[in-house]
C-alpha cells in the first residue's frame, strides 16, 4: 500500500474511531463524519485521476455534493436540538427516552 492511500485510509479510520468513542456532543459527531467524508472524497478523486476516464470524473463531485447536503442537514438538526433542549448532548437527544 502506498503512503498516500495509507494516509487516507488512516484518516478515515481515525474519523470512524472518533465517531465511535466521542459520543457526547452532536457537533463532535458531525465533525467526525465530515472528516470521514473528506477522506473519502480525496481517495475517490485520486482513484478517478489514476483511471484517466472521463466517466468516473463526476463521482467525486457527486460525493462532495452529498457531503454538503449532509453537513447542512446536520447543522440544522444541531440548531433545532440546541433550541429545544438547550444543549447538544447526544444523551439528551435520545428518542426513546430510556
UniProtKB/Swiss-Prot annotation:
Where does it localize?
A: Mitochondrion membrane
| Residues annotated as transmembrane | 1-21, 26-46, 61-81
The record gives the membrane topology as:
Multi-pass membrane protein
Q: Which reaction does it catalyse?
A: a ubiquinone + NADH + 5 H(+)(in) = a ubiquinol + NAD(+) + 4 H(+)(out)
Q: What EC number(s) has UniProt assigned to this enzyme?
A: 7.1.1.2
For this UniProt record, the keywords arranged alphabetically read as follows: Electron transport, Membrane, Mitochondrion, NAD, Respiratory chain, Translocase, Transmembrane, Transmembrane helix, Transport, Ubiquinone
A Gene Ontology biological process noted in the UniProt record is: ATP synthesis coupled electron transport
Question: What's one Pfam family here?
Answer: Oxidored_q2
Q: Does the keyword Lyase apply?
A: no
Q: Name one GO cellular component term.
A: respiratory chain complex I
For molecular function, the Gene Ontology terms on record are: NADH dehydrogenase (ubiquinone) activity
Top-level EC class: translocase
UniProt record similarity statement:
Belongs to the complex I subunit 4L family.
Q: What does this protein do?
A: Core subunit of the mitochondrial membrane respiratory chain NADH dehydrogenase (Complex I) which catalyzes electron transfer from NADH through the respiratory chain, using ubiquinone as an electron acceptor. Part of the enzyme membrane arm which is embedded in the lipid bilayer and involved in proton translocation.
Q: Mind telling me what this protein is named?
A: NADH-ubiquinone oxidoreductase chain 4L
Classification lineage: Eukaryota, Metazoa, Chordata, Craniata, Vertebrata
